[in-house]
């Protein structure tokens, strides 16, 4: 009888295991593959657990997939949505479908091209990049073409930088490199340390400006009439697009699923009041990329050090 009872008990355990989710969580936070976004995702995770008692799962996702998840109920929060990069997604999911909500608070940012001090002696503007005699200083593999990092392979901004290179004309005499950001930043460190010229895509807030004296390349101010970016859902969007001016004014905000906000209005208010500063975002980037802190460890310490502020976000 005891044997039969044990067998029945084990069968019940296995049956329950089959229907109950392992490590079930209350919400899903998308995590971008850049350091400040990784830190912010984990700060929201720890902060929400502390103030509302809900456990969040962190899922590494690009912004496009995050928006699809927000729209379909598979993702609840995206910590950094960059504009104007993702204005097409915002138009579709925020303005037209109303399935995604943007926080009213944004962090001012910018993006463009930067040069190391040695490169800036020769290359001062994007027009200089179209001069092969000047860009030969960027040639590191002796193939006759200079190299320039334009971003990580999965970033939308990387495709836009390729459009800009083609439109300005410097794409013809430069090898446009796409690699993950940590690899590129290591290359910047090495270039500055050895006095080797380097030009690369840059954005701020970012820790690289705490480490090095970089020069932002000059270019014509943004002009909507000269900035025609075809939606990335078109397979030929890069070849169909053109952009011969600087990026428009940039910012990033938190996004969350509208349905999630209705289900958890207290957390929606919390998200609406998150007010990271540019300096804080730079410190996040520095902590993860330079000090090599794990995102969850950094976030736990950040929430502890900013307990009063977290309380304020939750009470407003």
Segments (PLM) and residue ranges:
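Short, well-ordered beta-strand elements
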Residues: 25-36, 54-59, 145-149, 271
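A conserved helix-loop-strand patch within extracytoplasmic ligand-binding domains
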Residues: 98-150
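C-terminal lobe and pocket-closing loops
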Residues: 209-270, 274
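N-terminal segment of the mature folded domain
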Residues: 63-116
């Amino acid at each position: 009888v005891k044997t039969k009872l044990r067998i029945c008990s084990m069968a019940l355990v296995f049956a329950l295991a089959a229907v109950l989710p392992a490590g079930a969580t209350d919400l899903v936070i998308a995590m971008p593959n850049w350091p400040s976004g990784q830190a912010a995702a984990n700060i929201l995770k720890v902060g929400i657990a502390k103030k509302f008692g809900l456990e969040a799962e962190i899922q590494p996702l690009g912004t496009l997939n995050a928006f699809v998840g927000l729209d379909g109920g598979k993702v609840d929060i995206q910590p950094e949505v960059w504009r104007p990069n993702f204005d097409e997604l915002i138009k579709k999911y925020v303005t037209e479908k109303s399935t995604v909500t943007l926080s009213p608070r944004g962090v001012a940012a910018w993006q463009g091209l930067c040069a190391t001090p040695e490169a800036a002696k020769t290359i001062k503007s994007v027009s200089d990049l179209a001069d092969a005699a000047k860009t030969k200083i960027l040639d590191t593999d002796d193939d006759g073409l200079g190299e320039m990092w334009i971003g990580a392979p999965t970033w939308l901004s990387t495709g836009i930088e390729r459009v800009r290179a083609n439109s300005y004309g410097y794409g013809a005499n430069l090898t446009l490199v796409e690699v993950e950001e940590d690899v590129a930043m290591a290359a910047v460190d090495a270039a500055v340390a050895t006095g080797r010229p380097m030009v690369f895509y840059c954005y701020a807030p970012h820790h690289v400006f705490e480490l090095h004296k970089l020069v932002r390349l000059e270019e014509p101010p943004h002009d909507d009439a000269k900035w025609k970016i075809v939606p990335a859902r078109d397979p030929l969007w890069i070849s169909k697009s053109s952009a011969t001016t600087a990026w428009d004014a940039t910012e990033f905000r938190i996004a969350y699923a509208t349905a999630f906000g209705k289900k958890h209005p207290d957390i929606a208010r919390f998200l609406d009041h998150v007010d990271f500063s540019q300096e804080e975002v730079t410190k996040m980037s520095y902590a993860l990329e330079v000090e090599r802190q794990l995102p969850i460890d950094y976030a736990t310490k950040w929430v502890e050090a900013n307990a009063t502020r977290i309380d304020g976000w939750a009470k407003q």
